[in-house]
Amino acid sequence: MAIEKYFIPDFVELQRRSFQRFLETGLIEELNKRNPITNSQKDLEILLYPEYYKLAPPRWNSLDAILLSKTYSCRLYVPAQLTNRKTKQIMFKWVQLGDIPLMSKRGHFVVNGAARVIINQIVRGPGLYFSEIQYNVDSSKKTLVRRYAAEFISMRGTWLRLSIDKEKMIWAELKKTPKIPLVWFLLGMGLTEKILFQSLTQPKRLLYNYLDYLKIDNLAIDVKSQNDAFAKRALLRELLLKSKLNSSNIKTLKNSKDFKPLLLVNDIYSEMHSYKEKENRRYPLNSQNGDLADEKEKIPYYANSSLKALELIYSKITNTKKITNLNKKFFAKQGQKWIFKKFMNPRTYDLGLHGRLSLNKKLSLSLPLSQRTLTMYDVLVATEHLLRVEQGLLGTDDIDNLKNRRVRTSSDLIQMQIGIGLLRLEKNIRSKFTTIKGVPKINYFFSTKPLNGALKEFFGTNPLSQFMDMINPLAEMTHKRRLTTLGPGGVSRDTATMDIRGIHPTHYGRICPVETPEGKNAGLVNALTTFARVNPEGLIETPFYKVYKGQVQKKAGFFYLSAEKEEKAIIAAGDLNLSKTGFLPKGLIPVRKFDEFTKVLRNYVDFMSVSPLQMISVATSLVPFLEHDDANRALMGANMQRQAVPLVRSEQAIVGTGIETRIASDSGHVIRAKAGGLVGYVSGQKIRIYTFVSNF
């Protein structure tokens, strides 16, 4: 233990590294999303150059900001170019967009003189997830039917859900919008019928939505032609079928078991004819009124083209039942706008880089990573996967598995808020485009209020921005390493189930199973473990030693594994006695493979844990003899240490675990030298250190 404490990573690294990532890439990425800004006539254009942005030195340091009740921030300047195509003029100038709050060395922000910490939020990662839905068939609620759903989750924009209901109909669902038949949605996104029905192994399933309208008991598609539909029974109650026969040959076909008519559906699925089983003559069905349908009349419930699908989608979401010839074009255009705005506009819908990576991997697609919006092929292939999940050929996703969850660090949350501020700035600029007179200057269009207002809202009112817990150094440390599932875009403490609150096998080495609050927030607010880190994708990783033929390769360093990479690995415990040459003990060794504990020979081991402290958090690792504690008492002990009043004069713990020094050092409450060396002089004003390192 005495040696291992020096390999423990910096405890505040998560906060500092995430903010560094925001300054290096996140800010530039967010500014590029609003580039360029043009007016409606396209003759005025403002272009920003985010790669060359500059931050002016802050007016106060973090300590002075606290004393003066100011914000520790710096001014953000970006070069901007205004192009006037009417006068063929180009103006260039540096403009101030706003003030960016800076993070201190200790990993917190100073806003209006108060130290604030941004909590790390753990949410479902962007991508595609398959889940199971259970429906009650009867009123007794004893008979359950299992159905499945596919859900597209985006970083920004509307979530889309493809669900199969208990009648086996497939629907496209959005929040606050009536559900739409999947055929309409796919055709509305631009797919043709030929591609649609040839790409799916079960094209008949897309027609199940129309059985209710046609009142057919069962419908099946002939695989060879994909154009012939068979009905087991002859009764088609409210459907009007047309006939090109003479009136003398017309007979009324009634519901009878003797007749099994063939319903011929042509390529646009709009004309149907009925046949008698043993005769070649055509028998059109009468409607309930006894009238035959007009030859030009078509079944209004099936869309035979993208244009028709767009009309139906818009009429569905606006609850407009009747579509006349006058407003057909308007409806189609509005439906097209609606689909584009919801899923195909990069300004309103964004899967993110990791969302596109996840989608390509799950659906075996090769779309470019720059394609951050949803495409028709994403939805089409997801439909095919959903049908395979229903057949049992593919499995559903475990949403509690950490491979399906992402951590939103402070950089991600600030970047999202800056995106909101830049959107407001863009709207301001567009409104000023309409009111300008004469030759405008660049400064006329820009204001610091939109960006500053958005950041002020975030730091002041967002539940993830909290006053720093300053009871003692440990309280500060754990506050900066906290993970929560609450907050905007997360779960609600009132509706959270035990599955969300429980401990998952993938939590090992990533989320502490002990440290969590008591009460309503139990299991929803957690702590990062001692050795864990968050990679740029937002996945929590934990280190292991590689084991090669039974020998632990300590000199090779740590191998950080995410939950997905660890799934198939066989991992040995970190407290095994090794030989002098680094070999694991002979005989059977207790190991873990995902959620199973078993024993194997050392040659089968892939990795070894780096320390017994790996599975617990910083606060829990301060509890002496933790292995002898009851779990509930250990939880209370870990929490109550944060409430301890600090000593006026620091003392070493009588009973300690060995990492107290690191916690005090990383908290920033002690004086730290830039490099190690020999102390040569100490006074009330300075400490002089002689070091062997020349440049530091």
Swiss-Prot record:
Question: What are the alphabetically sorted keywords of the record?
Answer: Chloroplast, DNA-directed RNA polymerase, Nucleotidyltransferase, Plastid, Transcription, Transferase
| Record localization | Plastid, Chloroplast
Give the organism, scientific name.
Stigeoclonium helveticum
List the protein's name: DNA-directed RNA polymerase subunit beta N-terminal section
* Source organism, top-level taxon: Eukaryota
Miscellaneous comment as given in the Swiss-Prot or TrEMBL entry? In S.helveticum the gene for this protein is split in two.
Q: Which gene encodes it?
A: rpoB1
Give the Gene Ontology MF terms in alphabetical order: DNA binding; DNA-directed RNA polymerase activity; ribonucleoside binding
Subunit info here reads: In plastids the minimal PEP RNA polymerase catalytic core is composed of four subunits: alpha, beta, beta', and beta''. When a (nuclear-encoded) sigma factor is associated with the core the holoenzyme is formed, which can initiate transcription.
Return the similarity comment: Belongs to the RNA polymerase beta chain family.
User: Which Gene3D superfamilies does this UniProt record tie to the protein?
Assistant: 3.90.1100.10, DNA-directed RNA polymerase, beta subunit, external 1 domain (2.30.150.10), RNA polymerase Rpb2, domain 2 (3.90.1110.10)
